Amino acid sequence: MHQVLTRRDLIRAAAAGVSTLTVAQLPSWAFATGEAEEDGRPVPFVDEQPIDPKRPMLKWDDLRDWITPKEHFFDVSHYGTQHVPADSWRLSVEGLVERPASFSLDQVKSRARQEVLATLECSGNGAGADFMGAIGNARWAGARLADVLKECGVNSDAIEVAFWGVDKKKETIRGNEYEQNFARALPLAEAMRHDVIMAYEMNGQPLSVAQGFPLRLIVPGWYGIAWVKWLSRIELRERRLMNRFMARDYVTVRGDRHGDTIRWTESSV
């Protein structure tokens, strides 16, 4: 017999100190229908995913395979979709490297090709009724990031690798406006993993514009915010990148209790 989750259940859970209860963590019976307990009302979970044509999402009922077709893949970007001409596009590698370099798409493709089967999920997936399909599985193919970094020669002072996309927008920082390209960073050890690639193919076909053509960073195990689309610049750094998407947005807040005190800390996703 299925149990019905009511508002009272959620309130009791919250009172008991359960602070991380999310839709994704609820047991399957939480979505069952039935009669509410006396004086209780069922929580109105959405049983049909709303459709927003301006924000493509995975349609769960249409799934027929573990690999998500490109046309069913979700699309999220912060500074708008970018249409980048392949013939004029370049990838620059700079910063703390012995041999700074610039690569055309053909030059990237001339490196050893690696295929990675990985799940891409937006960190906001499940945050609302209209944002329940920001996840998908795909076969990504491209050049290993570590190979390119080794080719350029990583300086011993480097601790982090920052990745910039072509997309940009003016951001307000301390009351002033500055044009900022979208950027994220990885610790050097993560960037050197064998499964981190710069992809130019998805499911055996060239990347679509929405998925980051001509080149996209693929970082299995990290949320989609780290999978930089329309990749155009890589910088080896001796200091942490502290931009909007590393230090202000996309951070988790955690409280650790020490006696009667809770210590709150923020960490990048």
Give the residues covered by each predicted segment.
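N-terminal secretory signal peptides and thylakoid transit peptides that target proteins
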Residues: M1-V18
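Detector for intrinsically disordered, low-structure N-terminal pre-sequences
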Residues: Q3, T22, P42-F45
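N-terminal cationic amphipathic segment used for targeting or macromolecule association
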Residues: R12-A13, S28-A30
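Generic macromolecular interface patches on structured domains
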Residues: T20-L21, N155
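Short hydrophobic alpha-helical membrane-anchoring segments
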Residues: L21-W29
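Structured, non-membrane catalytic/scaffold regions adjacent to prosthetic-group chemistry
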Residues: W29-V269
